[in-house]
């Protein structure tokens, strides 16, 4: 159209007001947001609102290109822009930034878990051998996974759970192969959870390769005494926020130990797992993966419905073995 004599008379769209943390990338972000509307035939008002919102999100975050929003983030921000003056601190927006970019799809994965620490230490002690031999054992187990991948044609469908206490060399050997890799952060058998690494867990995760999935085992029953339950919830919230911030996927291994008898877990046909998952979702804790004990067919259906309702971006469920007989595992998968 005609260019007005005064700039104040030109077409304009106000931008959301945000706390500025970074001065780079706003122009690129504006153009990307503008084009996301223009290429779909939107009018200039919509295009400019999307462009302004994209630019606002980038300057409200640290970094440049990595701060660019996805369409889901942009839609959420536009719907809440009036009250989101500090986008960097909004948990839902940070979660969307974590889960909505394109990620590798795992429709099926066969995982060999050998992140055991206290159990293998005890076996070594019983056998009268030094625990110093355990790192070599874990390297051999990585070789076993590689051989299984080759012989059974499981490329892109195989993985391992490996610790960094006895398995640091094994982790290095497994990383970079395109495997699904989980790495535990909890001190074995700690209840409430104690993180094994020294220092804030958020700082620790910043040094992990992005392909390694943060795995945490948590003993949690919705009927636990309030102090213990709250301690576990606080630790899981801290871990969830740290993993989201560092860009790592999170696997939450949930074991509903019976209150008053932590050596035994609740049966798979009661609702303790479902109630525990619901509680975590209510707290804003949305792990990318769940690791759950075998459940009844009815419970699996309820879990599937719960995940679909509360976290459509969930990566899936890994089923716990817990030394169960093969017949029980087959039934649980069915």
Language-model segments: which ranges?
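Conserved phosphate-binding/catalytic region of the ribokinase-like
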Residues: 1-90
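Alpha/beta catalytic barrel-like cores
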Residues: 86-226, 315, 327
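Conserved, mostly hydrophobic/aromatic
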Residues: 112, 253, 290
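Alpha-helical scaffolding segments of alpha/beta enzyme cores, especially the outer helices
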Residues: 136, 140, 231-245, 275-279, ...
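Catalytic beta/alpha-barrel core
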Residues: 160-163, 212-232, 269-272, 276-300, ...
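Alpha-helix-loop-beta-strand connector modules within alpha/beta enzyme cores
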Residues: 175-186, 232-251, 303-319
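Internal active-site segments that recognize and position negatively charged phosphoryl groups
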Residues: 225-266, 273-276
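Catalytic-face loop-and-helix region of soluble metabolic enzyme cores
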Residues: 289, 293-334
